[in-house]
């Protein structure tokens, strides 16, 4: 922040000039409780600082006699995470009026603004990328990143007049609240789209999606069946992890898929002899069922295999199903198996041992459902994919909008601390930014008051 680029009436000063750093309460582990009792005070720790506010759901409590009066959080304080194993945590801040008496631990500190400095202005400054980047560069430690009190001597903050500080803080309160509201609404959309996709699949497998095609609400041509009647061949995957003879074949693992979509680039290849190659080779539209997984949400899920033209096999974490293509489409089967009643049946068919969830071929073949004619299956698949493509387009637009919104906060903060949000206000209020109201005069007042009190910087030492 170059002094030559400052607006009229502004100045720059180290953060330590316009605030006093209060160090946190030191206590032993055995002195802390996880519940409140008489003569104890709640303690804010670094993990309680979230998104500029205090998360008070996981507080510890220490005896009041360990807490000095100066260490109690005041409404003006900006509490800072002073020490953390993560650079993304160290330096983060919270400024919030608490409804109860509270203090903060030794891994935190509080910036207490001077008399002529707006606490809200300082709080917004600690959200800026300029501040965060400076903190990141100044924090040091082998395993733990620490901010030293002297670090605040090295972080300069642009200072306008007190009146302008308050105007800037008010504008930021309004603008950033609007950004947060927009972000919150955008973040809800993926869940809405998830429910939309689930509703589409429910309509697909119940026949609702193709009522108009049948010209009837009755499921004409649909019949009850089980999966075993539609399977031509089933096989557990290859157990060995290496081979000595034969052709080198890609053996697919669960790591080669994400959300049932193929990931290219990190496949494992194993040499298979001709007998093994014949047994474990995949064909287009085969179904791979996740046979075993630590997650019950993943075990038993169906993945439609699409051939890339190469011979590929599959490992023993999968069961391969080869379907009768004259009776059922593989894509339609994934709709049946991965949502609703089909998924409920398969999940309840899992057996659990040593933290692993497993499903067997017998349980898979026992999956029962209503099967429409092949022509109607094709129409269902077409409509589902069309609706899913629509949802995917919306989701992509939402993600792009979220990226822009996330950058908007820093853009607004940067404009604020360059004086761009208050240019018109300064033009309309020259008396409030000049002479005795200028930032330079304000800093002189702070300097004079500190001289009289013996220098408040000494308060930065461990309280």
Swiss-Prot record:
GO biological process per UniProt: DNA restriction-modification system
InterPro entries: Restrct_endonuc_typeI_TRD, Restrct_endonuc_typeI_TRD_sf, Type-I_RE_S_subunit
Entry keyword set: DNA-binding, Restriction system
Pfam family, one: Methylase_S
Region forming the signal peptide: none
Domain of life: Bacteria
Keyword Amino-acid biosynthesis among record annotations: no
Keyword DNA-binding listed: yes
Gene Ontology molecular function terms on file: DNA binding
PANTHER family for the chain: TYPE I RESTRICTION ENZYME ECOKI SPECIFICITY SUBUNIT, TYPE-1 RESTRICTION ENZYME ECOKI SPECIFICITY PROTEIN
Subunit annotation: The type I restriction/modification system is composed of three polypeptides R, M and S; the restriction enzyme has stoichiometry R(2)M(2)S(1) while the methyltransferase is M(2)S(1).
Function noted in UniProt: The specificity (S) subunit of a type I restriction enzyme; this subunit dictates DNA sequence specificity. In the presence of the R subunit the complex can also act as an endonuclease, binding to the same target sequence but cutting the DNA some distance from this site. Whether the DNA is cut or modified depends on the methylation state of the target sequence. When the target site is unmodified, the DNA is cut.
Stated family: Belongs to the type-I restriction system S methylase family.
Miscellaneous comment text of the record: Type I restriction and modification enzymes are complex, multifunctional systems which require ATP, S-adenosyl methionine and Mg(2+) as cofactors and, in addition to their endonucleolytic and methylase activities, are potent DNA-dependent ATPases.
UniProt comment concerning the protein's domains: Contains two DNA recognition domains, each specifying recognition of one of the two defined components of the target sequence. The recognition domains can be exchanged between different S proteins, generating enzymes that have new sequence specificities.
Protein name: Type I restriction enzyme StySPI specificity subunit
Organism of this sequence: Salmonella potsdam
């Amino acid at each position: 922040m170059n002094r030559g680029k400052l607006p009229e009436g502004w100045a720059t000063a180290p953060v330590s000039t316009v605030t006093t750093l209060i160090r946190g309460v030191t206590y032993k582990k055995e002195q802390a409780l996880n519940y409140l009792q008489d003569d104890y005070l709640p303690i804010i720790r670094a993990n309680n600082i979230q998104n500029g506010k205090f998360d008070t759901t996981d507080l510890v409590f220490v005896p009041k006699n360990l807490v000095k009066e100066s260490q109690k959080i005041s409404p003006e304080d900006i509490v800072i995470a002073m020490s953390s194993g993560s650079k993304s945590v160290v330096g983060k801040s919270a400024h919030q009026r608490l409804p109860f008496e509270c203090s903060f631990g030794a891994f935190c500190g509080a910036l207490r603004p001077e008399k002529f400095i707006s606490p809200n202005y300082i709080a917004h400054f600690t959200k800026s990328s300029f501040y965060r980047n400076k903190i990141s560069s100044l924090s040091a430690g082998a395993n733990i990143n620490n901010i030293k009190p002297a670090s605040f001597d090295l972080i300069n903050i642009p200072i306008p007049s007190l009146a302008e500080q308050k105007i800037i803080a008010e504008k930021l309160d309004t603008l950033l609240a609007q950004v947060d509201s927009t972000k919150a609404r955008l973040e809800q959309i993926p869940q809405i789209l998830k429910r939309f996709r689930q509703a589409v699949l429910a309509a697909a497998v119940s026949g609702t999606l193709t009522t108009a095609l049948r010209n009837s609400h009755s499921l004409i041509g649909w019949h009850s069946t089980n999966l075993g009647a539609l399977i031509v061949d089933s096989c557990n995957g290859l157990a060995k992890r290496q081979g000595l003879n034969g052709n080198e074949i890609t053996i697919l693992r669960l790591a080669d898929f994400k959300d049932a979509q193929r990931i290219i680039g990190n496949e494992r290849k194993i040499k298979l002899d001709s007998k093994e190659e014949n047994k474990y080779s995949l064909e287009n539209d085969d179904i791979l069922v996740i046979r075993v997984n630590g997650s019950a949400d993943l075990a038993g899920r169906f993945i439609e295999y699409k051939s890339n033209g190469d011979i590929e096999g599959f490992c023993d974490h999968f069961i391969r199903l080869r379907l009768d293509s004259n009776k059922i489409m593989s894509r339609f089967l994934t709709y049946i198996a991965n949502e609703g009643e089909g998924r409920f049946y398969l999940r309840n068919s899992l057996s659990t041992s040593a933290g692993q969830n497993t499903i067997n071929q017998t349980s898979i073949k026992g999956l029962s459902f209503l099967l429409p004619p092949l022509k109607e299956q094709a129409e269902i698949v077409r409509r589902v994919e069309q609706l899913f493509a629509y949802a995917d387009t919306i989701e992509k637009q939402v993600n792009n909008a979220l990226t822009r919104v996330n950058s908007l906060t820093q853009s607004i903060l940067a404009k604020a601390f360059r004086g761009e949000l208050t240019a018109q206000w300064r033009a309309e209020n020259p008396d409030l930014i000049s002479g005795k109201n200028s930032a330079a005069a304000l800093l002189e007042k702070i300097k004079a008051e500190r001289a009289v009190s013996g220098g408040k910087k000494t308060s930065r030492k461990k309280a």
